[in-house]
């Protein structure tokens, strides 16, 4: 496989790639959020009917809320990262998550760590995500903690 300006061999990049910046990653996040919201809403309405919100406010859907709003998004993200290198939103913008040192696929452990490291990026007023806009390699704090970067793979053959 070859990429414009970046030599590829066994899914490892031999030269510095083009990193994906803040605005494109934010766009990908919104796409992923929209897809997940629709899927989760359809599942919850199928299970609880149209009065899901009322039942949720009464505390009658806690198990489903945790399963479908916490566990499902985590599993979906980690599985997409592991098997596709990106979530649907990142695939749409031709981006891929790779190991920051080798530019190859990150280990599953790194990907799980990356997901949970989102908390470090979120808690202090989303500063860990804003960091992407100013970082040389466009890494958020979750990327730095997990040892990953997000690169553009648009020109891959």
Give residue spans per PLM region.
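Membrane-interfacial and juxtamembrane segments of integral membrane proteins
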Residues: 2-157
């Amino acid at each position: 496989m070859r990429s414009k300006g970046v030599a590829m061999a066994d899914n490892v990049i031999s030269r510095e790639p083009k990193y994906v910046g803040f605005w494109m990653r934010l766009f990908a996040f919104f796409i992923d959020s929209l897809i997940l919201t629709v899927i989760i809403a359809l599942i919850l309405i199928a299970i609880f009917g149209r009065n899901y919100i009322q039942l949720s406010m009464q505390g009658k859907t806690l198990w489903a809320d945790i399963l479908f709003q916490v566990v499902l998004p985590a599993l979906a993200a980690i599985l997409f990262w592991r098997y596709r290198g990106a979530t649907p939103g990142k695939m749409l913008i031709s981006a891929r998550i790779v190991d920051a040192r080798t530019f190859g696929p990150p280990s599953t452990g790194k990907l799980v760590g990356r997901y949970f490291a989102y908390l470090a990026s979120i808690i202090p007023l989303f500063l860990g995500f804003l960091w992407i806009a100013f970082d040389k390699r466009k890494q958020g704090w979750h990327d730095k903690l997990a040892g990953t970067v997000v690169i553009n793979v648009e020109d891959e053959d």
